[in-house]
Amino acid sequence: MHSARQKLLSTLAHKSFRLGEFKLSSGGTSDYYIDCRTTTLDAKGSRLTGEVFFEEIRQRGWKAQAIGGLTMGADPIVVAVAVVSGELDGFLVRKAEKQHGTGQRIEGFREKGARVVIVDDVCTTGASTVQAIEAAREFGFEVVGVMCLIEREDAKGRPNVEKAAGAAPFVSIFTANEVRKEHMLQNDDTEPSIFAAAAACEVCGRLAVTNNPRPRCEAHKV
C-alpha cells in the first residue's frame, strides 16, 4: 500500500506540475511551473496534504499549538492540517493590515506567545514565507518550525527562509526535482513526446519536452 507521502507526490506530479516556458513572480523564467492549489484544493489532495504535514510536525516534536502562513498559497494547507489533526488551530497572514474593521493582519488563531508552525505551498525566493515569519513574530507568536510543500532548489530561496527562521528548522516536504521526476515517470508510457532523459532543445538549449521529430523545448517544438 502506498503511503500518504507517495500518494501526495503522485497527485502533485499529475495535477500540479507543468512543463513549458513560464514567467516567475521573481521576474525570471522557468521551463516548468507548479500550481500546488490544484492539489491542495482537491478533495483527496487536501486530505493527503493534511496528513503529510501533520505527521511531519508530530515526528519533529515541535509541540505546536497552531499552523499558519501568508494568504493565499498557505490557506488550503492550513485548513487541511487543522481538520486532519483535530488539534492544531489555524491562522492566516494578510499581505497587509486591513484598512477597516479591526485592522488586524493575523486572522483566526490569535493567542500571543503560542508555539506556531509557518507553512507555504511553493518556496521559490522565499519572500512570502519570510513575510509570514516576520508577521507571526511581530504579533507575538513563537515560531518553532517552517515548512513548505515544494522547494524550488534552483531559485535558492532556502538561505532567505533560514535567515528569517533563525533557530526554527525549515523543512520542505518535496523538492521540485522530486515532483518533476515523478511527472516524467507518469508520462513515460502514455505520452512518448515527454521523456525523462536530460535532452536539450536544439534551438535554445533548454530542457526538451519532445523528441519527435527533433529535440525541442515547449517554446520551439514543431
What are these regions (language model features)?
Residues N211-V222:
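Cysteine-rich micro-motifs
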Residues F53-A64, I133, R137-F139:
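Phosphate/pyrophosphate-binding loops at sites that engage ATP/ADP/AMP, CoA/4′-phosphopantetheine
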Residues M1-R60:
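Active-site-facing substrate-recognition patch
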Residues H2-T11, E134-A197:
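PRPP-dependent phosphoribosyltransferase catalytic core
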Residues W62-G73, M147-L149:
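Short glycine-rich phosphate-binding loop at a beta-alpha junction
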Residues V78-V117, T124-V130:
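Short, glycine/charge-rich flexible loops or terminal/linker lids adjacent to PRPP-binding catalytic cores
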Residues F195-A200, P213:
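Short metal-coordination and nucleic-acid-contact micro-motifs, chiefly zinc-binding Cys/His arrays
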Residues C201-C204, C217:
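Short cysteine-rich clusters marking metal-coordination/redox-active sites
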